[in-house]
């Protein structure tokens, strides 16, 4: 197997067939819905909140609400249903999450999307949760993860998952690769390619995205959707503390397995960093959209399918993907 990551690969351009990059269509379909771009902000507390989720849904973007305020999920789903917006939430696998799924079914609430979100998704507990959701809420589109092998993808698909999330520890505030010795950090793009070859259903690439060009690379190597954390951190709308240093504003960004999220120093696989304030989320989304349109034009097509067919070169290798602990 070839081992490489985002910074090791360059895509090779094809003849441009559009008069303007603005003609290029970045639309993607996931389940029963079409979205403006194949991107989704990470379901982390410093990346997504209810107001951001509503903004994204109103404007045709996919989102996944985090699971770290469990009691707010049912009111959130009700609110999104009332507003006729897409409802997309996360669950874990503990006993209280099983009860939560039962409560959704009891109230007749069917979220459009449920993401089963744990660090090591190739597990019996995730398989059982997939089956539970599919039994109680059969119309819900189930995303399961995170995984890093073809075996895991096929097993979760066979259990009933409608999509799998690929990536074990490549994120900017994840230190799984250093703390445990396991994961896809440093070879996330190759892991995506490996998993995509086995997949029969959509894959969401999760982690390791450092530039907008990495979105196109993810599409090339098999992703239907790309989950992004650090590029969506530090915005005006983002949750988390703000601090000023030497006249420059910074916002906190921490991992879901960090002590800042857990509230205790136990089984820590995440850290906190401070991101320079980036201004409005809307502006970042516009720039991301324009850059992806440019990627399509370089691929020689009019839509995302063109990116899947381009050739590529491997230019170097860097095991830590630019990160330090």
UniProtKB/Swiss-Prot annotation:
UniProt-listed SUPFAM superfamilies:
Inosine monophosphate dehydrogenase (IMPDH) (SSF51412)
Q: What is its EC number?
A: 1.7.1.7
Q: Which Gene3D superfamilies match?
A: Aldolase class I
In the UniProt record, the signal sequence range is none
Q: Does the keyword Membrane apply?
A: no
Reaction equation(s) it catalyzes: IMP + NH4(+) + NADP(+) = GMP + NADPH + 2 H(+)
Q: Which domain of life is it from?
A: Bacteria
GO cellular component, alphabetical, reads: cytosol; GMP reductase complex
What CDD domains would the database entry show?
IMPDH (cd00381)
Q: Name one GO biological process term.
A: purine nucleotide metabolic process
Q: Where does NADP(+) bind?
A: 203-226
**Which keywords annotate this record?**
NADP, Oxidoreductase
InterPro entries named in the record: Aldolase_TIM, GMP_reductase, GuaC_type_2, IMP_DH/GMP_Rdtase_CS, IMP_DH_GMPRt
The record places the active site at 174
Q: What class of enzyme is it?
A: oxidoreductase
Q: Which GO terms describe its molecular function?
A: GMP reductase activity
Give the family, as the similarity comment puts it.
Belongs to the IMPDH/GMPR family. GuaC type 2 subfamily.
Q: PANTHER family given for it?
A: GMP REDUCTASE
- Say what the protein does: Catalyzes the irreversible NADPH-dependent deamination of GMP to IMP. It functions in the conversion of nucleobase, nucleoside and nucleotide derivatives of G to A nucleotides, and in maintaining the intracellular balance of A and G nucleotides.
Name under which the protein is recorded: GMP reductase
Which species is this UniProt entry from? Helicobacter pylori (strain J99 / ATCC 700824)
Which gene is annotated as encoding this protein in its UniProt record? guaC
